[in-house]
A protein has these predicted regions:
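A short alpha-helical cap/connector motif
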Residues: 1-113, 120-141, 145-202
């Protein structure tokens, strides 16, 4: 099946079934960033239905490019498998089923790009588990970091969002430490941060 047809089908499925995927306003930036860094080894937390993995796959290093993607939800994991199996990238994408906080403790590989797009309140905890496996100069992308304008805006978040907003603020404070990362935050969609890791000895 042609990749564009699969992506269109995924967009429709996501809209009908209320599955969070990259917003249209973010897709161009996302593809530009992946194309710019052209990673060989990618770790994604939060596969959902495999939309972002299939956006990344054709932009990776042609010979060695590989994506490892983690998803907790049973239905989304199966849908991601279904869509990826229809594509030409089945050999380039490995899906792992489970809670990322557990799966990440079992990592053995090294990654030059990480995409955080799972539970927003877990970003910092997950990054701390991932960093020992990130190559110096590796890139960490995190989606939804501005969370409806509450994280860096003047708006007071509703009570139900206060914990997630506080944790995203803590995440941004961490990745904006200039001794550890060079970080840029893009306002598209719900905000995406791009952090270049300076290495373990900094």
């Amino acid at each position: 099946m042609i990749l564009n047809d699969i992506l269109n089908e995924q967009r429709i499925y996501a809209m009908i079934n209320d599955v969070p995927i990259l917003r249209e306003s973010e897709v161009h930036l996302f593809e530009e960033l992946i194309g710019l860094y052209r990673p060989t080894s990618v770790l994604e937390v939060g596969t959902a239905i495999g939309y972002s993995a299939l956006l990344m796959a054709p932009l990776l290093d042609e010979e060695e490019g590989h994506i490892t993607s983690i998803e907790l939800d049973d239905v989304r994991y199966e849908m991601a498998k279904y869509y990826i199996n229809q594509s030409d990238y089945t050999d380039n994408i490995t899906l792992l089923k489970g809670d990322a906080s557990q799966v990440l403790t079992e990592l053995t590989g090294e990654y030059d790009l990480v995409f955080l797009d799972g539970p927003k309140g877990q970003y910092l905890k997950q990054l701390e588990l991932i960093l020992p496996h990130v190559k110096e100069g590796g890139v960490i992308l995190a989606d939804n970091v501005l969370f409806r304008g509450y994280v860096r805006g003047d708006k007071e978040p509703p009570k139900r969002f206060k914990t997630i907003v506080k944790r995203l603020q803590e995440y941004l404070t961490y990745v904006e430490n200039k001794e550890l990362f060079n970080t840029t935050i893009y306002p598209m969609g719900d905000g995406m941060s791009v952090s270049v890791w300076k290495g373990h000895n900094k």
